[in-house]
Amino acid sequence: VPETSWKTCTPETAPEFAAVAYYFAKNLHKDLNIPIGIIQLPVGGTTVEAWTSRKLLLSDKDFRPIIERYDSIADAYQSGEYEKIYDRYIKSLAEYNKLSAEKKQYIGKPTEPMGKWNFRRPVGLSETMLNVVSPYTLKGFIFYQGESNTARGAQYRKLFPAMIKEWRASWGQGDIPFLFVQLPRFETKTRYWLSLIHISEPTRLRR
């Protein structure tokens, strides 16, 4: 990987690690007494479809609308509509900032327009980060994601295991371990959060 190298974990470099990855490696090193290397791709606020390929999303009728809807919206950005959409976003953001200063409770932040350049788009991280590191030999994966899919729990139940299967196939190392974190409770009134926690349970049992 260009301009990238292994770094020894020290008090100076430790803050660069994702917390889950750091403590996982620390405990593994303690148990095995061997060097533990971590290739981390820490990107917060992502959906599971950002980590899957276009081929996978198009292969299933339940996933296909994700990529088709995104392509339709992104094409509109390229056809001269983006400036109008972005202007609306800026105005909404200004109103959000004003209301946030006046109120203590959470106010929904407007969603920034997401064109084809945005790495958080569907398939975005699969086409960038994953493609760069997939040649590396691994002992397994650790994965912490799901908050951004809480409103689509039923779809996540099917797409997440499909993503796991695709990752294993991409690395070509057989049924290597895939460990993931069940989402903790979060200070929110939405019913979707607990739903996604429950949905992850069958996946955990199958793995």
Please place each PLM-identified region on the residue numbering.
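Solvent-exposed loop/turn segments at secondary-structure junctions
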Residues: 42-48, 147-151, 183-188
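Alpha-helical scaffolding within the catalytic cores
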Residues: 119-132, 158-166, 192-196
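Secondary-structure transition/capping motifs at alpha-helix termini
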Residues: 30-34, 166-176, 204
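Metal/cofactor- and membrane transport-associated sequence elements
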Residues: 1-137, 178
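Short glycine/threonine-rich loop-to-helix capping motif typified by GTGT followed
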Residues: 55, 151-156, 186-194
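Single conserved hydrophobic/aromatic residue that forms the stacking wall/gate
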Residues: 197-207
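Aromatic- and acid-rich polysaccharide-binding/catalytic face
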Residues: 134-151
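Active-site segments of SGNH/GDSL-like serine hydrolases
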Residues: 173-193
